[in-house]
């Protein structure tokens, strides 16, 4: 079900089965020429059906729809390659896009664990059952990269991108 939050701005609640988070709030901006979906849910059938139902209720044509992913976690990115069409742009942070390019993704974790003696077979089992891996996009998305301060316009809305990294460029964690 889609709830109108403001004129032209809607929320679709996407269930996240077996997750302590319970649901993801996916936001949809209906524009005159293009629509924008913000975050998609896990790449699972139940999530896909909830999203499709909400989009159908709103009369969203995916051929006229772009996507913005707020960060790299599978509950936010999982369905994007199932929903996006040839005409869709997928907006994503330049920093988080490195994960999908292999700089800081699952393979780095696997390599690190193996170098430090974690048994490869156990690692593959653990990875196969991890929801962040299991429910991620089917294929690598093609991104339109965003940087801090960039603007996205859709309908009556202008969204400003604000980078809020927990790691600096050298990989040091920020705390405080």
Write out the residue ranges for each language-model feature:
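Conserved beta-strand hairpin/beta-sheet module of binuclear metal-dependent hydrolase folds
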Residues: 2-58, 173-176
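A short catalytic or substrate-binding loop motif that flags glycine-/basic-rich loops and adjacent residues
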Residues: 19-21, 144-146, 164-168
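Divalent metal-coordination and catalytic microenvironments
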Residues: 8, 29, 39, 71, ...
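Core dinuclear metal-dependent hydrolase active-site scaffold
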Residues: 149-175
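Active-site HxH/HxHxD metal-binding segment of metal-dependent hydrolases
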Residues: 43-47, 56-152
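Conserved beta-strand segments of alpha/beta enzyme cores
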Residues: 10, 89, 144, 158-160
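Short Pro/Gly-enriched beta-strand edge/turn motifs at strand-loop
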Residues: 7-14, 129-135, 155-157
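Structural motif
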Residues: 34-36, 66, 157
């Amino acid at each position: 079900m889609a709830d109108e939050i403001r004129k032209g701005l809607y929320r679709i609640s996407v269930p996240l089965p077996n997750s302590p988070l319970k649901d993801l709030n996916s936001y949809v901006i209906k524009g005159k020429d293009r629509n924008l979906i913000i975050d998609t849910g896990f790449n699972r059938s139940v999530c896909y059906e909830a999203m499709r139902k909400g989009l159908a209720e709103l009369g969203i044509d995916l051929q006229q729809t772009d996507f913005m992913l707020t960060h790299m976690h599978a509950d936010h990115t999982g369905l994007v390659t199932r929903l996006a069409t040839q005409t869709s742009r997928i907006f994503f942070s330049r920093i988080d896009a490195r994960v999908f390019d292999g700089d800081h993704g699952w393979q780095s974790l696997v390599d690190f664990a193996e170098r430090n003696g974690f048994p490869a077979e156990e690692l593959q089992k653990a990875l196969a059952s991890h929801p962040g891996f299991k429910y991620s996009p089917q294929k690598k998305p093609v991104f339109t990269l965003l940087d801090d301060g960039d603007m996205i316009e859709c309908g009556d809305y202008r969204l400003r991108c604000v980078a809020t990294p927990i790691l600096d460029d050298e990989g040091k964690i920020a705390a405080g």
